[in-house]
Amino acid sequence: MAGELISFGIQNLWNLLSQECELFQGVEDQVTELKRDLNMLSSFLKDANAKKHTSAVVKNCVEEIKEIIYDGEDTIETFVLEQNLGKTSGIKKSIRRLACIIPDRRRYALGIGGLSNRISKVIRDMQSFGVQQAIVDGGYKQPQGDKQREMRQKFSKDDDSDFVGLEANVKKLVGYLVDEANVQVVSITGMGGLGKTTLAKQVFNHEDVKHQFDGLSWVCVSQDFTRMNVWQKILRDLKPKEEEKKIMEMTQDTLQGELIRLLETSKSLIVLDDIWEKEDWELIKPIFPPTKGWKVLLTSRNESVAMRRNTSYINFKPECLTTEDSWTLFQRIALPMKDAAEFKIDEEKEELGKLMIKHCGGLPLAIRVLGGMLAEKYTSHDWRRLSENIGSHLVGGRTNFNDDNNNTCNNVLSLSFEELPSYLKHCFLYLAHFPEDYEIKVENLSYYWAAEGIFQPRHYDGETIRDVGDVYIEELVRRNMVISERDVKTSRFETCHLHDMMREVCLLKAKEENFLQITSSRPSTANLQSTVTSRRFVYQYPTTLHVEKDINNPKLRALVVVTLGSWNLAGSSFTRLELLRVLDLIEVKIKGGKLASCIGKLIHLRYLSLEYAEVTHIPYSLGNLKLLIYLNLASFGRSTFVPNVLMGMQELRYLALPSDMGRKTKLELSNLVKLETLENFSTENSSLEDLCGMVRLSTLNIKLIEETSLETLAASIGGLKYLEKLEIYDHGSEMRTKEAGIVFDFVHLKRLWLKLYMPRLSTEQHFPSHLTTLYLESCRLEEDPMPILEKLLQLKELELGFESFSGKKMVCSSGGFPQLQRLSLLKLEEWEDWKVEESSMPLLRTLDIQVCRKLKQLPDEHLPSHLTSISLFFCCLEKDPLPTLGRLVYLKELQLGFRTFSGRIMVCSGGGFPQLQKLSIYRLEEWEEWIVEQGSMPFLHTLYIDDCPKLKKLPDGLQFIYSLKNLKISERWKERLSEGGEEYYKVQHIPSVEFYHRVLHIFRSVGGDITGRLLMR
């Protein structure tokens, strides 16, 4: 494996040496000799890599080669950079440079010559230990095996493919939680990769479990957990979102008290995923009171975590898959076409496949990974070769798995790493930077990879860095080495993470290759670390980092901080780290707020992030960083001075500016023609004309001020044909123009945010036809926008937010909005009348109407029939909405709250709400009577009623809803509904009836993410 990684490094160094000849004037002979030596060196690598496992000396040679390659890249790149910097210097600097040119070139000539000498020595050493040379004609060639492995995989990932043979386990676990009242804690234990988390997720999402419990919480505990973090997460899950800030400010004692009170009075299921030690469980469990309304489901590799000698504790140990189930799972992944009518598996492949899965020992993860490797192997010869490799990797032919020895699984999973193309090996190893269970942002990861030169030039071909990153992540996902799912809105992989066992492999390989050093302020740090000579340094969860004291490696290429909050940077001198390519200081606090000017000496830097940093002053020396492709200065809540030095960073692909730079800051950005993402661009600090040449932009966020007209904006961004996401926020005058004044003629635009005064939409041509997401706010549209918007055939999500529409009537026409799935109508204060024609919005699933106080009634007919979730708040409906909503045969969740209905009587008719499962009614202050006819709501399992002061009795029809499992209602009903009470007969069949002393805070907008964003603006 090291040989392929080195081959990748040689390729990069070869590319550096193959630049324009004029760059190497004065050192031409040394460069030519170095290229010849590299060509010679590459011919020894294959055999050296094969022999390094049996020869410590050869292994040392391979390690020395890696160091030579790194040093070579540093030397050549520094020489080229200094040449280019000299060309762009002023006259005085050029004169000084000419005076130093001879000694400088002599120094580099000696340095390059030294590299050749080191290569010659390592070749002699390898030859003396029997390493054979393979003849390579011409220039450096990538190994043929790489080219074969780089073919795109042809199998598709089945989302349920790992759920094989586990149905009986799910049924048994659900039974423990739902049917056995004496059981309090159920632990699922077994080795990593057994499918414990998959099993727990199936149970967590099971309908019977959802019916049984009022509150559900899922917590990933991990090795580095703190008790406060776990308790806070549980309370956030069980409490409404609006209390999150209050929860985060609680002391530990207050937090414990709140949780105890909550768990004493409600039925809650808490899932604690991946607890490592018995002591961890002992730290967490003080929040659980003796009252037995709560239950815990936990997963662990350690059986002793929650072992007790009483019947309230159950330890469940899933067995490995049977041979038959293993074969079924393997076929789903390795042979995705097996269900096609014409498909017939080759007999030899079947024999080899069944032989290979024996090495997996029934472990689902190992089977998935093995299947992922074989899915791209089309011939029996390929399968036979891999079968032989698996046998050679297994020690002593072990096939049994246990918690004491995971070598077999590691070998199988490691083989999936060996099968990766060399560039994907680098991509995979980079994931070792991140802590356990960490959700990695794919966009950031893509720029890390690009900054380190991992991307192959042939993969660019006009693509953005994010596009290339998506291709790489997709390959890793398809090989089941990385876990990720495409985001519904963007169709991209937005985040990813590693399975525990695959992370172990990643850390192991990173250690073998001395790929990075990990330091953590957490009590339990990464269990596999490299030495301090690593070229990459990762600090996880620091409180303080002292650069001069904590980092003592002048050859460092990457310094990355992973954190969940702010931290202090002490001794902010980077003078000894001049070879850095990646510097990520997210959420850093710098004393005095001024970034040190020595940052300008990091001329190799490609990636610099000061996102959310407490920095008030960026130095002028930042302009020296000509190679930057990623610069993130985004900050909120404070003004940050940024000097006008960005125009020279012509390699920039990603630029995020501070949200507030003050009126005095003026930035020239017209040279940044390679930008793909530009965040927080403000016309207060830059000219709109600078945008004209940024034709590669795919994401643009603009803040307008008073002096800017929409016509000027339209002229400036009209040529940005590759825009996919556009946000425009108007912080200036409300009277820019009486017309829209801008045509969004972007054929690739999918997501559009507009917060600006735009009282009219003349035609649908204002919006591109491929738009999938549209948010409008503060537009003050005078005419109904629906006739225009409903013609957007690809629109899936629409929000008309605060003051977006000032008219009274909206009509959704027949056939309109053919793809719309979510509709949010928020704070439309003048809106009174809504008409929906038949066949409008046929795919609508979620409807959210909030603070539309003049809306008196819903459309009597033709509400989209496929609606599954509806939330109505502050709407003041005069007519009973239930007869209309009851006809929605797919509706599963309904929330009516906060004076939404101002009438007296509501009726649920017989046969109405045939699929409704959850009904929440609260704060209807005029509501007096509720009639539920027999046959209504046959599948209702959860009912909330609270703060409806004029409602005097519950409907008799409740006694016929036998599916009802949970009733939550305010304390004033306790006497009437308790045993012996006059209405007890209506609720005696309900397993759980709970009474509350205070108002239930159960508000949860179905469009919660949209509402949250609205409130943050």
Curated annotation (Swiss-Prot):
The lineage of its organism: Eukaryota, Viridiplantae, Streptophyta, Embryophyta, Tracheophyta. ATP binds at residues 190-197. LRR repeats lie at residues 602-627, 649-674, 675-699, 768-791, 792-819, 841-865, 937-962. Residues 25-52 form a coiled coil. InterPro entries: Apaf_helical, LRR_dom_sf, LRR_R13L4/SHOC2-like, NB-ARC, P-loop_NTPase, RX-like_CC, Rx_N, WH-like_DNA-bd_sf. It comes from Arabidopsis thaliana. Residues 147-460 form the NB-ARC domain. Keywords: ATP-binding, Coiled coil, Leucine-rich repeat, Nucleotide-binding, Plant defense, Repeat. Potential disease resistance protein. This is Probable disease resistance protein RF45. Gene3D superfamilies: 1.20.5.4130, Helical domain of apoptotic protease-activating factors, P-loop containing nucleotide triphosphate hydrolases, Ribonuclease Inhibitor, Winged helix-like DNA-binding domain superfamily/Winged helix DNA-binding domain. GO terms for biological process: defense response to other organism. GO terms for molecular function: ADP binding; ATP binding. Belongs to the disease resistance NB-LRR family. It comes from the Eukaryota. CDD domains: RX-CC_like.
